[in-house]
Each structure stands twice: as C-alpha cells, then as structure tokens.
Amino acid sequence: MTIDISEESLSKESADLLKILLKDRTTKKSIVWATHSYELLGKGFAPSDRITPSRVTGTYANLIQPRSEKSKYEQKDRTKIRAEVFTPTWLVEKQNGYVEAELEAMDLEDYIQVSWLEITCGEAPYMVTRYDTVTGEEIPLSERVGFVDRKLQRISREVSDEVTFYELIKEVYRASYGYEYQGDSLLLARENLL
C-alpha cells in the first residue's frame, strides 16, 4: 500500500487544487524544484525551474514520492547534498508533547489560535503525521501527533455544532505555518495537510 497522494488524481478531481498546491505564495508563480534530483529528466526539471501540473502528472504522475518510498540511494544522496533528514514519529510525538503540555490548560479558542511554525518542514511531520516519514506506515487519525493533528483532535472531542466545528478548523490552518525550500517536499507537505 502506498501513502503517496497522487498528483494525477488531484488534477483529475480538481485541476485548480493542484495549481493552488503548486503556487509560491511570495512570487505568485509556481514553486521551483530547488533540488538536482530531477534534472536528468531534461528541460523543466532544473533546480530553478518551476513545477507545473504537467511536470507532476501524465508521464510524470509518479515522479514525486514521499521519502519513505524513495530508493535508499536517493534518500542517502538527499541527506548528503541537502542535509535532508526525517524525524521519526516517536520523536515528533515527544517534542510536540512537551509543547502540548504547556498549552493543554488553555480554553479551546485560545489553543486553536496559538501560532506554530515548522521550519524546514520537509513533508511536515511536526504539523501532520499522516504516515511515519521513516517507515511509510499510515497512522490512524486518532494516533496522529502533529500540531495540526492535535488541534483537530481536540476540536473533534469538544465541539458538536457543525458551523462552529468548521470555523475552528479554518482557524487551525490559519495559525499553522510550515517553511520548505525544496519544491517536491513542499508539495508533499501541502498534500499531507489536505
């Protein structure tokens, strides 16, 4: 079983959604590859080239994969060249748990509005733990430990009104930030937040 979210499927379900996921919020253009991993594919795949829907669908539909599904050689190469490492879920749980312990006494609305930033987020495991970034095993909703996951779990436990529920969900996303330079990892992070 794969934990990858198919860009091909995203494009078919909503071409606009894929374009949104590929948009650089600063330049208003598409995000760049920012990695040499794909440049052997030719024009359009250099580190400074922009990632367009046609570069991740069709012939290239399975090009971008989570780290756990990349070859060991590719994992090692990206670690060596870009210092790309991935934190195992048990460590994310422990570190986020320390912060969570400081926040658990807050009322729900204040808790939801606490801003969190995951810098150099990779696939964003500190935000959302859809799967273990090391093993690739999918993690059930109730066991996810990212800071967005924890906020969503608390809303699910404490809110029964549907309108309030959805408003608070939007607030969670408005208060959650991740920064990533490499375009493929950024796209994976954004997909994980869906």
Question: Which stretches of residues belong to each language-model region?
Answer:
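Conserved S-adenosyl-L-methionine
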Residues: 91-94, 102-194
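Non-catalytic, mostly N-terminal accessory regions of nucleic-acid modification and defense proteins
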Residues: 1-115, 121-124, 176, 190, ...
